[in-house]
Amino acid sequence: MTTAGAVPERTQVVRVAVSVPQALDRRALTVRVDAVRYTIDDRYQWSLPFGAEVEEALRTRLAARYPAYVFVSDLSAVANRADKRLQFVFDRYEADQKGSAVAHGYCSLRAGNQTVWTRPFAFHTEAEATPEGIALALQSLLDAALSVCVLEPEGR
């Protein structure tokens, strides 16, 4: 866990937040892939609890991509300091039992009261129609959604 004393003053702190549709049926088979637990019912597959687990998966990916930044969801860990706020809003993030998966929504970056950018994303993929195949497809959709999120210019 990151503490306020562990974050140098010159390190950028980015608060990551995820907004999602209300979670659906919780009585189903569960498959865990990456940091996200995917739950399957008769028609669709979701991540439950979606927001917290997807947020953790996104923070892990962002930290690997941008090691000069600290990514948090709870600002108390860094003395309520946030230089930027990265918001992911998912309108859809689901798969059906035939192996079709979709992620749709947008992400935005704010610095202070200013919106730096807002970018939509819409990705669709086909997967092996097994719980593991569908979970891997949903995981790849997270990577695709993250691909539209650029915190700094390339080559920096």
Segments predicted by a language model, with ranges:
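Structured segments of extracytoplasmic/periplasmic soluble domains
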Residues: 21, 57-68, 144, 148-156
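Soluble periplasmic/extracytoplasmic beta-strand elements of cell-envelope proteins
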Residues: 12-18, 30, 85-89, 102-108, ...
